[in-house]
């Protein structure tokens, strides 16, 4: 799984600017639910072959004992507790503040790896920017400018020096060649109940294997003589015990589990409907390209009218996930839970499918013969052949000419054709267009030799005589 970097510091030291630099995007997921502050952002980035997850916390005010600032401090400490590396950010222009000393003392007690980051140091010599922050006793400071992007590569390289490259990450327990299932969803939708039902229903063989991320557990189990790995983000208790409190929710763990899985079971609450946080999690699943099964829980206790109304609402709001199978279940009573596993198997098979190039090309050419792409100006785009470029999710690469002019509607037409023909149900499908390189594009023709110029002149004279 990706290592987690948590940005901590007092207000207005440039945490959000640094976050946007590290993720190269302003479209971070925002956790806007009770128990998590509004300005906690989650995003992921990559330095070369090293991926990472970044958490941007609110301004840390540890001395405040009540109100919203106290809640923000509590949530910041919770984020630190989930961190692999804490980036403690201070303001190089304002210098060392008393609040920085208090925060440093708080962070030192956590036992996490802490990197002191002196921000807003553009145009300042290293010695000038860093000298007074040695007093904090957190080691040699990293001096950066988030605004101008200065020295950020060195910062991330230092932060990730103890973590493996992408190739090594793929060798983790969650990446073995059998279905790896993550149960995702917001709090109180019944994730824990579903996990216990899955592990207890068929007297499955279960044993706990510590994961590479703190508090995540890989549970290997057998169902129908097939092996699976279930990623439990909340820390699964033995099935004989009762869940005493509302299941713990960690956005970081949820995102990491989604990325580590082959198939995600997204659990929704039939009685409370789809929330904004449900949409955030679904969007992240779609972005990462993981196969998906949707379990709409708490179906018991609803009359026929409520069920009919709820079905229509979910089908309308989940139209952007129309590739996934929907199941209406009661995790508490086990109703409909058995039907989840065949959908998980089908989604896994589709996500890991290997499609031969000749078959892909034949299907693509048949789709083009049935409906050609619209003209993009003077010429019509020409699709020549297709091949598979990846799995989990399947990536189909189409080669041809003038493909930059293929509209989005035609791309969806090809995507739906590939999905229907090759039965890729339960997984996102990505179609990428690549135009062949023209080595002469943008180049002028070489000058004619004397003999070539004489012959061209003769041809022009003959044509004038012939056609007047």
Swiss-Prot record:
Residues 456-468 have a biased composition (Basic residues). Residues 353-437 form the KH-like domain. The gene is der. PROSITE patterns: G_ENGA. Keywords: GTP-binding, Nucleotide-binding, Repeat, Ribosome biogenesis. InterPro entries: AAA+_ATPase (IPR003593), G_ENGA (IPR031166), GTP-bd (IPR006073), GTPase_Der (IPR016484), KH_dom-like (IPR032859), KH_dom-like_a/b (IPR015946), P-loop_NTPase (IPR027417), Small_GTP-bd (IPR005225). GTP 1 binds at residues 9-16, 56-60, 119-122. Residues 3-167, 179-352 form the EngA-type G domain. Residues 434-468 are annotated as: Disordered. Disulfide bonds: none annotated. One of its GO terms (biological process) is ribosome biogenesis. Transmembrane segments: none annotated. GTP 2 binds at residues 185-192, 232-236, 297-300. This is GTPase Der. Associates with the 50S ribosomal subunit. Belongs to the TRAFAC class TrmE-Era-EngA-EngB-Septin-like GTPase superfamily. EngA (Der) GTPase family. GTPase that plays an essential role in the late steps of ribosome biogenesis. GO terms for molecular function: ATP hydrolysis activity; GTP binding; ribosome binding. Gene3D superfamilies: 3.30.300.20, P-loop containing nucleotide triphosphate hydrolases (3.40.50.300).
């Amino acid at each position: 799984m990706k290592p987690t970097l948590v940005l901590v510091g007092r207000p207005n030291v440039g945490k959000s600017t640094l976050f946007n630099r590290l993720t190269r995007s302003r479209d971070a997921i925002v956790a806007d639910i009770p128990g998590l502050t509004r300005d906690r952002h989650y995003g992921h980035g990559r330095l070369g072959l090293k991926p990472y997850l970044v958490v941007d916390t609110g301004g840390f005010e540890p001395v405040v004992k009540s109100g919203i600032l106290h809640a923000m401090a509590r949530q910041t400490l919770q984020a630190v507790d989930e961190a692999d590396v804490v980036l403690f950010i201070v303001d190089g222009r304002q210098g060392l503040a008393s609040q920085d000393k208090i925060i440093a003392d708080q962070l030192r007690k956590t036992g996490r790896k802490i990197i002191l980051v002196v921000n807003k140091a553009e145009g300042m010599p290293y010695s000038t920017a860093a000298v007074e922050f040695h007093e904090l006793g957190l080691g040699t400071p990293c001096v950066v400018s988030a605004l101008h992007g200065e020295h950020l590569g060195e910062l991330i390289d230092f932060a990730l020096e103890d973590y493996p490259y992408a190739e090594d990450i793929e060798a983790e327990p969650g990446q073995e060649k059998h279905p790896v299932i993550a149960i995702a969803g917001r709090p109180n939708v019944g994730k824990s109940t579903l996990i216990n039902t899955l592990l207890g229903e068929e007297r499955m063989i279960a044993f706990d294997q510590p994961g590479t991320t703190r508090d995540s557990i890989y549970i290997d189990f057998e169902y129908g003589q097939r092996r699976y790995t279930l990623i439990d983000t909340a820390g699964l208790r033995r099935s004989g015990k009762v869940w005493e409190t509302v299941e713990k929710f960690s956005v970081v763990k949820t995102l990491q589990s989604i990325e580590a899985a082959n198939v995600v079971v997204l659990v929704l609450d039939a009685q409370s409907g789809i929330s904004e946080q449900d949409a955030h999690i679904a969007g992240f699943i779609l972005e990462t390209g993981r196969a998906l099964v949707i379990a709409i829980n708490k179906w018991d206790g609803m009359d026929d009218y409520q069920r009919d109304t709820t079905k229509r609402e979910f089908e309308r709001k989940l139209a952007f996930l129309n590739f996934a199978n929907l199941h209406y279940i009661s995790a508490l009573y086990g109703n409909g839970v058995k039907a989840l596993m065949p959908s998980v198997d089908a989604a896994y098979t589709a996500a890991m499918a290997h499609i031969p190039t000749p078959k892909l090309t034949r299907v693509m050419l048949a789709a083009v013969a049935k409906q050609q792409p619209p003209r993009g100006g003077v010429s019509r785009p020409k699709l020549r052949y297709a091949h598979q470029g990846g799995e989990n999710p399947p990536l189909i690469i189409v080669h041809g000419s003038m493909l930059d002019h293929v509209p989005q509607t035609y791309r969806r037409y090809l995507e739906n054709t590939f999905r229907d023909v090759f039965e890729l149900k339960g997984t996102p499908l990505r179609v990428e267009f690549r135009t062949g390189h023209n080595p002469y594009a943008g180049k002028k023709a070489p000058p004619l030799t004397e003999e070539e110029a004489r012959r061209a002149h003769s041809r022009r004279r003959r044509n004038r005589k012939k056609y007047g």
